[in-house]
Structures are given as structure tokens and as C-alpha cells.
Amino acid sequence: MSFNNQESENLPTFADQKRKTVEVAEFTAEGRYKRKVRSFVLRTGRLSEFQKNAMNQHWGFYGLEHQNQPFDFPAIYGNNNPVVLEIGFGMGHSLVDMALQNPERNYLGIEVHTPGVGACIAYAVEKGVKNLRIICHDATEILRDCIADHSLGGLQLFFPDPWHKAKHHKRRIVQPQFVNTITQKLTTGGFIHMATDWENYAEHMLAVLQQAEGLQNTSATHDYIPRPDFRPLTKFEQRGHRLGHGVWDLYYIKK
């Protein structure tokens, strides 16, 4: 289907509408609804025609919408392979590369920035990746409403917004309630893999994960691991190296 004819030029496309409908919420430590807030800066940005066309033409295959019941992963992917969730995949190149390199896994990416969603879908189409689905919605609501307990094989969180100022640390996505929720969603033996190029956030992640029940740190030194070969080098990591930052990976297994 073409989206370039004159009749459709002035009409809002699916991608245009999606860019304006991302909603997020905040919950208390006990899990009760509190108010709308963001653990990220909502940079919807301007979709390029390339990104817009990718969303308009391929969302039907790659896209999943928020719903009020758990996703049926075997029906969605057509198999019973483990599902790895990545929250905040940016432009999606590393996520697509991991899906391409690991056909025995299914990947589910959540990203609220629509240019990144469009870029990820375009790259997935280019590479012919079929074991990947994308959600453009707040991760908190997806975890609450759409992901059944004990249904995920892993969680990836690479270079989330560190919220540098102390008064903004409460906005960091890695909080005890978040980790507890993820742990509930994991199958036994499932993993949590986080990475950051901000040492203070790495220490925060480590403290939160250490306090969580039912998780085991795979680090021989009980803190961080070297970047594993299976995690692609991201543009954020390259930026960190240029700025002289270290990079800290954390890898935990659900017992």
C-alpha cells in the first residue's frame, strides 16, 4: 500500500497518530496508582519519511498495542521460544541485531520515542527479522496489564536515563517495585541484564538488585560483569567511551 499519493498527503497517518498518544503513569512503592509522570524525557521528535513509512507499512506485523489482558506469546510469535523483553531500545539497532543472532529466542521491545520505533522496524524489515515485536507505550502499564507472571525468559535494560540530579533519582526506572515486578514476570532461570555508563546509577542498580528476593548475581565479584559478547556495542556505550565514562553490566538470574 502506498502512502505517498496526493489524497493521503494531508491526512494523519498511523505513525502520526501514534506519536501523539504515548501515555505514562506513576505508582507508589506499594503498586498503587499515583499520577501521570515520566521516567524518561518524552522526545517524540519528528518522524522522517523513512521511519513513518516503516511504521505505516509494517506495524501490522511488528507492532503490539496495550491491552487489558496478558499477551498470548505462542500465538503472537508462532512458537514457544522464550521471550526476552527490552525496555527503552533507542533506535533499535542492537535489539534487531540480537534478534537476528538468536533465532531461538523471541524479542519484545518497548520504546516510547516514535522515531526510534520507526527506525527499529525499518532495520528489522531490512534484516528480515521475524522473532521481534514492538510496543510504543509506557513500560509500567505494559508490565502491569499485558505480561503474565512467569512468562518472560529475560529482561534487558541498556543505558536508561540516569536522571543525574539527586532530586530526580525517584524518576529512575530501576526501583525496588520495578525489580520486584520484573522478577514476578520471569520464569525460573530467567535473567535480568542491565547496563549503564553512569557509575552512580550502576551503584544504584546494584543496591536495588542486591535487595531483591529470588535473584542471584552471576558476577564472580558479586557486583558487575564485563560486557558479554552477546550484547552489541551500542551508540550510548560508544558515547560513554568518548566521554571517558566506564560501562557497568549487571546480570542476575531468577532462582
UniProtKB/Swiss-Prot annotation:
<comment type="pathway">
    <text>tRNA modification; N(7)-methylguanine-tRNA biosynthesis.</text>
</comment>
<feature type="binding site">
    <location>
        <begin position="234"/>
        <end position="237"/>
    </location>
    <ligand>
        <name>substrate</name>
    </ligand>
</feature>
<dbReference type="Pfam" id="PF02390">
    <property type="entry name" value="Methyltransf_4"/>
</dbReference>
<dbReference type="InterPro" id="IPR029063">
    <property type="entry name" value="SAM-dependent_MTases_sf"/>
</dbReference>
<keyword id="KW-0949">S-adenosyl-L-methionine</keyword>
<dbReference type="GO" id="GO:0008176">
    <property type="term" value="F:tRNA (guanine(46)-N7)-methyltransferase activity"/>
</dbReference>
<keyword id="KW-0808">Transferase</keyword>
<feature type="binding site">
    <location>
        <position position="161"/>
    </location>
    <ligand>
        <name>S-adenosyl-L-methionine</name>
    </ligand>
</feature>
<dbReference type="GO" id="GO:0043527">
    <property type="term" value="C:tRNA methyltransferase complex"/>
</dbReference>
<feature type="binding site">
    <location>
        <position position="197"/>
    </location>
    <ligand>
        <name>substrate</name>
    </ligand>
</feature>
<feature type="binding site">
    <location>
        <position position="86"/>
    </location>
    <ligand>
        <name>S-adenosyl-L-methionine</name>
    </ligand>
</feature>
<dbReference type="InterPro" id="IPR055361">
    <property type="entry name" value="tRNA_methyltr_TrmB_bact"/>
</dbReference>
<dbReference type="InterPro" id="IPR003358">
    <property type="entry name" value="tRNA_(Gua-N-7)_MeTrfase_Trmb"/>
</dbReference>
<feature type="active site">
    <location>
        <position position="161"/>
    </location>
</feature>
<feature type="binding site">
    <location>
        <position position="165"/>
    </location>
    <ligand>
        <name>substrate</name>
    </ligand>
</feature>
<comment type="similarity">
    <text>Belongs to the class I-like SAM-binding methyltransferase superfamily. TrmB family.</text>
</comment>
<feature type="binding site">
    <location>
        <position position="138"/>
    </location>
    <ligand>
        <name>S-adenosyl-L-methionine</name>
    </ligand>
</feature>
<keyword id="KW-0819">tRNA processing</keyword>
<protein>
    <recommendedName>
        <fullName>tRNA (guanine-N(7)-)-methyltransferase</fullName>
        <ecNumber>2.1.1.33</ecNumber>
    </recommendedName>
</protein>
<comment type="function">
    <text>Catalyzes the formation of N(7)-methylguanine at position 46 (m7G46) in tRNA.</text>
</comment>
<feature type="binding site">
    <location>
        <position position="111"/>
    </location>
    <ligand>
        <name>S-adenosyl-L-methionine</name>
    </ligand>
</feature>
<keyword id="KW-0489">Methyltransferase</keyword>
